[in-house]
């Protein structure tokens, strides 16, 4: 059974919710799944003042443990059309793994959230995917086999590059049922592809 890490950074809980849905999907395909978050880099007083969600139950990941997994699914909210600085700092810290080729051949995937429909979902996914490709990972997206990302009948996330959600400028919109279904689909899809690759 493949061993999968869902690695995320979430300021207000939207990506935390998506991470749990991705993990649920991966487990439904028989994978062993851990959900972990990257360290917060914002000082506590500022995080509290800005109402960051500080009660997240997922343990904090370490760079060293990344090589223990067959697949890593990375998620973060967008910052100016790219991944958050917290996630970028964590991945930047994996230079030693890159130098040893420790992640070569592992499966990688991305998911994201933005405040608006045009707030950089796909560029944020690409910023994650670019890092994973530099690590030598094989990328798995959210294929159009997931029909929920089609149509314009409602505000919805999702792209062939990964599951997404839209939080609204004030963070009031939580991931919809469609967004969460997409996350579960991607988690299951990553688990199935990983199982084929690792035997």
Curated annotation (Swiss-Prot):
Top-level division of the source organism's lineage: Bacteria
EC number from the UniProt entry: 1.6.5.2
Residue positions binding FMN: 10-15, 78-80, 113-119, 134
Cofactor(s) required for function per UniProt: FMN
One Gene Ontology CC term in the entry: membrane
Binding of substrate, residues: 98
Species this protein is from: Rhizorhabdus wittichii (strain DSM 6014 / CCUG 31198 / JCM 15750 / NBRC 105917 / EY 4224 / RW1)
Major enzyme class: oxidoreductase
UniProt-recorded name of the protein: NAD(P)H dehydrogenase (quinone)
Keywords: Flavoprotein, FMN, NAD, NADP, Nucleotide-binding, Oxidoreductase
Keyword Signal carried by entry: no
Molecular function, one GO term: NADP binding
UniProt cross-references to SUPFAM superfamilies, sorted A to Z: Flavoproteins
Reactions accelerated catalytically: a quinone + NADH + H(+) = a quinol + NAD(+); a quinone + NADPH + H(+) = a quinol + NADP(+)
Textual note on the cofactor: Binds 1 FMN per monomer.
Residues annotated for NAD(+) binding in this entry: 12
Family label: Belongs to the WrbA family.
Residue span, Flavodoxin-like domain: 4-190
């Amino acid at each position: 059974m493949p061993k999968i890490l869902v690695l995320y950074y979430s300021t207000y809980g939207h990506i935390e919710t998506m991470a749990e849905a991705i993990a649920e999907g991966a487990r439904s395909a028989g994978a062993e799944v851990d959900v972990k978050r990257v360290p917060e880099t914002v000082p506590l007083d500022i995080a509290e003042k800005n109402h960051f969600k500080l009660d997240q139950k997922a343990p904090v990941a370490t760079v060293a443990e990344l090589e223990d997994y067959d697949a890593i699914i990375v998620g973060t909210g967008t910052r100016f059309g790219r991944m958050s600085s917290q996630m970028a700092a964590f991945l930047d810290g994996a230079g030693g793994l890159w130098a040893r080729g420790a992640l070569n051949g592992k499966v990688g995937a991305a998911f994201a959230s933005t405040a608006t429909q045009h707030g950089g979902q796909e560029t944020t996914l690409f910023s994650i995917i670019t890092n994973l490709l530099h690590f030598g990972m094989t990328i798995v997206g959210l294929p159009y086999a997931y029909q929920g990302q089609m149509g314009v009948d409602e505000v919805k996330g999702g792209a062939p590059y990964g599951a997404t959600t839209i939080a609204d400028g004030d963070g009031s919109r939580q991931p919809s049922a469609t967004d969460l279904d997409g996350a579960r689909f991607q988690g299951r899809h990553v688990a199935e592809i990983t199982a084929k690759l690792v035997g």
